[in-house]
Amino acid sequence: MTLVLKFLKRQRAVARCGAIILLACSASLSAEEDATEVFNFKVSLDNREVGWHRFVVQTEGDQLTVFSKAKMDFTVLLVKKVSYRHEATETWLGDCLQAFESETERNTKRVFMSGSMKDGDFYVNRNEEEVLVSDCVRTFAYWRPAWLDDEFLLNVETGKYTPVSLEVTDDRLTNMTKRVVGLPKTEIHLAYDNSGNWQTLESDLKIAGTLRYQRINESVGETDAKL
């Protein structure tokens, strides 16, 4: 009888250890699935620093939330001063956008944009009207380069669903992957390191000059609860 009791106690102890190991493994997998990525960029215009742009990408299982905030001050044609402020929040499920809100201020003009999924389709609220866009919408998600490969991308600042093209090349000299997003009137040049992390952005702006984003390690922007 004593041997039987010892055997049962040993079995219960093994079961408890197994349960603890299983919980530890589950916690580890959950930690891998849930992650936060921060992208801080110094912004320059014609090689002159004009501000910053910050992206925080939070992943929880299949859901992804992106908070972005930008601040830029520059002069156009040596005369016109431009003050630019922008904030946006995007919610994704898998690789399809579920909702977004944005607020953009240029000097004294402020623009609000939003959109969301309804009954399997994505609608953008534009000029106090709901505009049907598509069933699976992607934005200019530079932080997820694979999502740029689409026929149209949504600009969350303007609410426009823009036709795009994509070219991808590998630069052996720098070990960077270059992606060029083609738009109707310009191009956006992006560079990623060999781990797929976004490092730079460059685009020619009409009248204003060449806009360039350079990723930096230090934090940028004012203190913000979300950012």
Residue ranges of predicted features:
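N-terminal mature ectodomain segment of secretory-pathway/periplasmic proteins
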Residues: A35-M117
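Solvent-exposed helix/loop surface patches that form functional interfaces
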Residues: D34-T36, Q98-A208, Y213, V220-K226
